[in-house]
Amino acid sequence: VAFQSVFITGASSGLGRGLALDYARKGATVFAAARRASELEALAKELAAGAGRIVPVPLDVANLDAQEKAIRAAEAQSGGALDLVIANAGVGTPTHALDLDWRDVQRILHINTTAACATLSIALPAMVAQGRGTVVGVSSLASFRGLPGNAAYSASKAALATFLESLRIDLRGTGIQALTIYPGFVRTEMTAKNKFPMPFILDADQAVRTMVRGIARGKRSIAYPLPLVLGTRFLASLPAPVYEFVGSQIAPKRPRKKG
């Protein structure tokens, strides 16, 4: 599948940045959306001459009205509809339940779930009108069960995965694909802040290759790396009391408050 027009959120760093470069190098016009305009400009300059094009789209995905305007503008520049839209922007900081602040919970759920679902739903009408297109949501292996110390993050990514599952049913026969990506640990700015072991962690380039290959094949579920996928699927199969006991044994200790 050759995508000519691609819209990616969270494109200034990590997976989003890698995806933007990969598709642009394949000849696509990539609308790279993120808050940090300077990083987007640097991304556009990194693209070699003769490849596709990266169009910087300074955007805070939390602002849903701004998202709609940005996607509509990208559609207009693409002749009516986008070929591929990837809801990649996300946030999350491991936090023990006793230290959760409702404002942080609201922010994580709004960006990871509401804003991501908005990205995809805004792009759908034009895709349906042209009879083809692909929407992709970046969920997480953390969505398979509620991970200790990650209540808001796990919930937000599980909600996105369920949203996409519903889309797949509703969009049957329209020519539109709805794909879900379940990354494990990837070396990015976000995971660099983690203070706990991250087994089977991948470089961003490795992860991007896996994602691009899966999207090209139209795989409804793209999960990686395999050892961590098998582990999380095993945990997902456990009865609730057993999982809760196992979770309590592997849970990171609650950080001590200073002072």
Feature-to-residue mapping (PLM):
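Conserved glycine-rich cofactor-binding loop
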Residues: 12-13
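Conserved glycine-rich Rossmann-like NAD(P)H-binding loop of the short-chain dehydrogenase/reductase
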Residues: 28-43
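Substrate-binding pocket helix/loop in short-chain dehydrogenase/reductase
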Residues: 96-97, 101-107
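Active-site loop immediately N-terminal to the catalytic Tyr-X3-Lys motif
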Residues: 98, 147-151
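Active-site helix of classical SDR
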Residues: 120, 156
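Residue(s) in the substrate-gating loop at a strand-loop-helix junction
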Residues: 140
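C-terminal helical subdomain
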Residues: 180, 196-231
